[in-house]
């Protein structure tokens, strides 16, 4: 439901749903789902403009993904892009970072081990939509 609200632009509802998932005791038993939820949480906070909190969330997400051996190249590319964007001053830099992310994700899409990430969320399509918005 959180992904549904995010894709439709209802970021506050997406945040409410993702917070409900984080409060659930069952989320800890599904590492794949928790990793996806943490990545989606980063995107939600980016979209609602919580850039100060995003810096902390990025560090916590990277630590979690590395500890569970779920820190793949796709996640690294998205997180590195978000790190650069929250420090960016103008939209030109932000747009350039999203263009670089799209190119990197396009090349990663060909990798067998990285292509499965699109089952949970299509980061390439999201980055291309962000370029159009800017």
Where are these regions (language model features)?
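Residue-level signature for tetratricopeptide repeat
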Residues: 4, 44-45
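Start-of-helix signal in alpha-solenoid helical-repeat scaffolds, especially tetratricopeptide repeats
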Residues: 33-36, 75
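Amphipathic alpha-helical segments of tetratricopeptide repeats
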Residues: 16-27, 60-70, 103-109
């Amino acid at each position: 439901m959180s992904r549904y609200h995010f894709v439709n632009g209802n970021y506050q509802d997406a945040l409410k749903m993702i917070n409900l998932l984080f409060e659930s005791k069952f989320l800890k038993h599904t590492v794949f789902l928790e990793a996806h939820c943490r990545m989606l949480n980063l995107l939600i906070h980016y979209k609602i403009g919580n850039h100060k909190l995003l810096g902390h969330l990025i560090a916590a997400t990277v630590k979690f993904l590395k500890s569970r051996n779920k820190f793949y190249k796709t996640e690294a590319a998205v997180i590195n892009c978000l790190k650069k964007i929250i420090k960016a001053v103008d939209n030109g830099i932000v747009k350039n970072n999203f263009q670089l992310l799209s190119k990197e994700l396009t090349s990663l899409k060909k990798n067998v081990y990285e292509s499965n990430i699109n089952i949970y969320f299509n980061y390439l399509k999201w980055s291309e939509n962000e370029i159009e918005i800017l």
